[in-house]
Structure formats: structure tokens, C-alpha cells
Amino acid sequence: MNDLIKPSSFEDELNTIISLFQGTSNNTEGCTPLVPSTIEERAKQRVHNEEILRQSNIEDVIKGAAERLAQDEGGIKTHPVNEDWLRQFKNNVQDISEKEMKLIWSKVLAGEMKQPRSFSIRTLHLLGKLSKEDADVITKIAPFTLSDDSGRRMIIHSDMDEDDFFKFDDLLFLNELGLIETSATLHMNWHFDKNVSDFSNCIKLNNGNVGININLNEKAYGIPVYTVTMIGNQIFSLIEEVIPRTDYYKRIIDKLYFKGKCVCGHIKDVGDDNGFVFSDSIFSIDKIA
């Protein structure tokens, strides 16, 4: 729709609101008259304009998904998508007008076509309720997350003041959305076959191409975390161009109690049970002594 003319009076503002409700704008040439003569005509006009806008929203998202799939190098084999899923997708996406949110929905559709069941119907319902401002909070927190080699996503925490990096209110907000669990008693636990003396028991964590190896000699170790839920994992995966906050990782891991060493760097190879292979080192922490 064309940009609205700024109202010069309350009457103009009222007419502008009415025109928005009907899907028209006062400065659109050739549009249907603002107030048709009968309620039946006004209802038909509103439904007509609303459905045109909805169809436009759906087609914008489909086009975005097609462009995303076309950009994948080497071509991508797509798979049939469940009809119930598609119906729920359409019902949610038809009322999405924000450009930034349309891009997110395009990524959802492309991801589901490449790998069905990547995004649950529950995730679609939650995503459909998110505003751009909500998405901005998720984007703000994404750089502080880490995933282990099984895909479990988390935010490590300790006694430090996290407000130096993010507001705890943001985490509480994501907790209310059902994306993370903020209970202070939660720990992520790792178990190894045996105690070792060479610190070869390794916890591997990463955020994109930034990885962390925490090498221990203990058979079991637990880290205090805020855990990301299944729906949270799916929604966080939609955030692109995340720049991991390695300054946070360094400070928070240095606060943890363990005997061993930690190295953070850019991942060159996923390596093996002994840790990632790095192309460089971003920071290291030695707690062997």
C-alpha cells in the first residue's frame, strides 16, 4: 500500500484509520470510495481488499523461499511438504506484512522443503504471533548461545553480572515465549567413559563456525545453563549472520570451576572426540595448574 498522508485533524485521522481497516488509503488514486453507501458493499470491499493483501503476502513469502532455494550451491533436492503443515503455514503467513518477518517465513518454507519436519506446527503458531520487536530480542540473544555436538542449545551462566552483556529481562521475555528455560538450578551434564590424566575428555560447543573445546580429566561434568527449548532451537536457527560473543564466552567459562583447559577458535574441521580442529585461536584458558 502507498504511504499514508499524515492526518491534519482528528477527522482526517479517523478517516485514515477507517481506510486502513477497509484496506484503502485516502491518497490512492482510483480506489474504491472510502465509505460505500451500504453495509453490504462496505463488507465486500473490506473482504476484497483484505484477501488481495493476504494473497500478496503469501506470494511474497513463496517468492522469497524460491530465491533462497535457487541460491544454494549445487542445487537442492526438495521434498513434498505435509498438507496440514502447509495449511497452517499459509494461515499464519497471510497476515505478515513486515518485510523482515517475511524473510524469516521464507527461510522457514525453504528449510521445510529441504528437510521436512524441520519446523513443527507449534513453532509456526508461535512464529505467527511474533512481532519484529520480538524477533529483535531473539536476534540480540542469539550471539550468546552455544550448542553441543548433539545440537542442544544453551546459554552458559554463572555468578557474574550478565547485565554487562544482556538484560536478564530479555531472557525472562524469551522464557515467557517458551523459547528458553531460565531456572537457575539447571545444569547441562556430560558423561565420559572414564577419568583420564591427559585431559582428553572434551566438551565441544559451538555457535556457527566458532567452536570451543573444554578439555577435562573428569568422567562427568555439569555446566550451569539456561536451556533452549525445542521450539527455541528451531526459531534460533532462523537467525542469520550471527556474530558469536566470544568475549562473553571467555568471561563466563573463566568463572566456571573445572580442572583442565579451554580453547576457542574458528572451526577448520569438526575433529573427533578430542575436540574441534581450529584454523586460529580466539582465546584460551588454562586451569590445569
Question: What do these predicted regions represent?
Answer:
Residues 3-115, 286:
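Eukaryotic partner-binding/assembly regions in large regulatory complexes
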Residues 7, 251-289:
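Extended, compositionally biased alpha-helical segments that mediate assembly or anchoring
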Residues 81, 160-212:
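Short amphipathic alpha-helical interaction segments
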Residues 89-93, 122, 126, 159:
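Non-transmembrane, amphipathic alpha-helical segments
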Residues 98, 190-252:
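Short, amphipathic alpha-helical interaction segments positioned at domain boundaries
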Residues 102-145:
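Short alpha-helical segments that sit at the start of domains
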